[in-house]
Amino acid sequence: MIIKSIELQNFRNYEDLNISFDEGTNIFYGDNAQGKTNILEAAYLSGTTKSHKCSKDKEMIRFGEQESHIRTVVVKKDKEYQIDMHLKHNRSKGIAINKVPIKKASELFGILNMVFFSPEDLNIIKNGPAERRRFLDSELCQLDKIYLSDLTTYNKILNQRNKLLKDMVYRPDLKDTLSVWDMQLVETGRKIIRRRKQFVDELNEIVHDIHYRISGEKEDLLLQYEPSIEDIFFEDELSRVKERDMRQCMTSVGPHRDDLLFSIGEVDIRKFGSQGQQRTSALSLKLSEIELVKRSIHDTPVLLLDDVLSELDSNRQNYLLNSIHDTQTLITCTGLDEFVKNRFHINKIFKVVQGTVEERKEI
């Protein structure tokens, strides 16, 4: 699959922009804070309905304007899709596929699969469990609409249970209703735990091989799913900690407390790995993500690289660039030295200056 073009109106610092992409490598270069990342954000938003930078639509609307429009044309298995997205202040975003409005955002998922790689992703190993859960959920929601539905349901039930726990401080008589939410939480939570475990097992096979090659055949990386409770024990554990949950007014066990273990040998590199090991592992994880998406959808996802090359040494740069030759890639960077040095083929080059984009014919 490829993104054929993107049109932006009043999106971030762009008043009116129309870009046609090559099916190979597309590079956007320029100084910081010129609008390079905004183009990648618009692409990611078109496929996932979410921004990697903010949670509120109004933050993406150009200053002084009331609404924003994004039109993305995607070609997938010889079929063309036009995705229109309207962002407005204090209103839910409007989405249409081939000019037909959709009622649920989940209807969009699966049309445009992407892998987003930014400098922040290099810290996924050393950051807290929430970042690693966000990674799991982001990838699974793109690939599995049932998982997306289950996760949405689980979060709603979790919020209701937590609200009830807080209300019980003043209304002890509400305790009898807690079991209703517990049953629903366990039923949905078990599905999430099982699907995450399956996903991590599949990902581990790929990440091990890739990391072994990147590390010069020196390191064996193991990726393991760490649920806060095994699915078969979820109901019993939730009952066991009920009094504690009531005191703390929060749900202390469940998939919302899960984690991913990254280990090399017997070493937990989340805590004890060197920066080099953590960054190489993060790169291995992202490259594995591309391969797993390929296997899952029998197509190649679009790769978005947001100023990540400057954070990698020359060996990792080289490995990354050589791994994406058959993938449509949108890259942002401040300069082109890495590509010249690595003799990397570039299909299209765009110079970005203060919200204007100019295509260049050569480096």
Predicted ranges, named:
Residues M1-D31, R171-V302, E311, N315, ...:
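Conserved NTPase motor "head" modules and their coupling/switch loops across ABC/AAA+ ATPases, GTPases
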Residues G35-K36:
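Conserved lysine of the Walker
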Residues T48-I125, P129-E131, L140-L143, Y147, ...:
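Nucleotide-state sensing region of NTPase/ATPase domains
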